[in-house]
Amino acid sequence: MLPSCSSDDAEDDSNKSITLRNHTESGCKDISSASNTSQFDGQALRTQKYMDSTERVSLKGNSKGTLNVFHENATFTCEAKFNITVNVSGNTIVVCEDAPPSTNCICLYDLTSEVGPLENKAYTLVIKDNNANVCTHQFHYSNTLDESFEITMGSN
């Protein structure tokens, strides 16, 4: 059973010092539409551009013993107000990217978080969007870790 985004979940004593720091977000990324189209056609084109954008996660270790998590092209509502948290249970790190879901439009965002300190060992990273799994990925942490993966349907 994977931990949830709730802070009420019990944490393993060895992970109490693992925290989330230095979170940044890009704001809604501008996807421009072609000129000379109707509003509907322009919206359809923007929607297609969003759908064609590759969602990706990059993991980078560093000399501080922390993990930089870069979530590129995460889809959320326009003008999202993010609440990013991390929960750890054993070797599972859950990054929760929550934003209110009610809106009439969607945007792509780049989200960056730093998690740590981590030990040089195997972990499972789970990224959740409004408490729904976006992806699950296993990695071995080291200060030289540098890997990326695409998020596709069924990657969780």
Locations of regions flagged by a protein language model:
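C-terminal motif of bacterial Sec signal peptides marking the signal peptidase cleavage site
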Residues: 2-4
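Exposed, flexible binding/inhibitory loops of compact, secreted disulfide-stabilized domains
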Residues: 6-156
